[in-house]
Amino acid sequence: MKPATPKAELLPSNQLPKAVFRGPLLLGKSFLGVLTICAVVMLSSWIATLAEAAPEEKPAANAQSAAEYKLTIPFGLEESKVVIPEDNPLSREKVELGRQLFFDKRLSKDNTIACASCHLAKFAFTDGKRVATGIRGQKGGRSAPVNFNRVFSSAQFWDGRAATLEDQSVGPFINPIEHGFANHDEMIAKMMKIAGYRKLFKEVFGEEDIKIGNVGKAIASFQRTILSGNSPADRFDQGGEAGAISEEAQHGLLLFREKARCTKCHSGFNFTDEKFHNAGIGWDTNTVDLGRYMLSKNPEDIGAFKTPTLREIARSAPYMHDGRFKTLEEVVNFYNQGGIKNPHMDPLVIPLELTDQEKHDLVQFLHTLNGEGWQQATAPKAFPK
């Protein structure tokens, strides 16, 4: 079978042991109550080094001090796992600037696509489509990934090609299918014509000249405030709320950890091992996306994609990196049969032999993973002029 080269990415009870989420297989150490991170920063002390997509930039000496920003971590998530770069600390002004940029369709070649176009709150910050759609209705080769809880994540995108959230934040602008700019300079030239943006960048970064690295910092800061936690499943296991989930879902949770082997990949409090796996997607139709291999050139990575979080999974259909499954039932059936055999199959993916009732209960558990912490990520009332 000849693998296909992917298109650009726009480019989804009483028998239970006590605290079944705890331990190395799933949520690990947890905290009671809501945790708060307070970051008070001086922007004038920055020396930021971004990767290829976001080159080195130094704020002007007269950059203002940033106002305190309080990142509230919902119950069930882990404060110690928060990743905020030293060269891009959170501030209220920067987060609000990032919000403007995230929702502004003018940051596309034809003024039709914003970051939020593919990351809609009602679809758990995906777009509800099999593959994402960019300018002029062009279709990408992959499903839009969720962008909440990115404050806990390392490599970004399905294939992990962006090492940081700052890099991820500016990559789509120069994707010909997504935002459509030929290069970052073209986009910056367009932004520089908007006096309101020059003013905001002056206030946040100390200079009117807009730099792509600072665009990435602002958008990444906003994305780090989009969270999902305090789900019924969290409250059942960690909060001791016995009635938070149904008995079917409780049985599904036990299956999740044991017979269904879900925690082999969907582990930890964010339900992801942050690694890359090949489950055989595409090998049945000769449409294999080479995935991680395109970056690593390691044959073991052929067809491997990053494990997505399962939080909000009931709202993020369709599923898999190519959006092939419309329902969670289809996903469970796929893994129950052991994926799709191929020469580079991850050995963790094996037939599960779940009964119909067990598959039903597992899906019921997955429906308990919707939470809160993202509801404040709304569009601004107005955009800079």
Task: Indicate residue ranges for each PLM-predicted region.
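Juxtamembrane cytosolic/matrix-side boundary and N-terminal portion
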Residues: 26-27
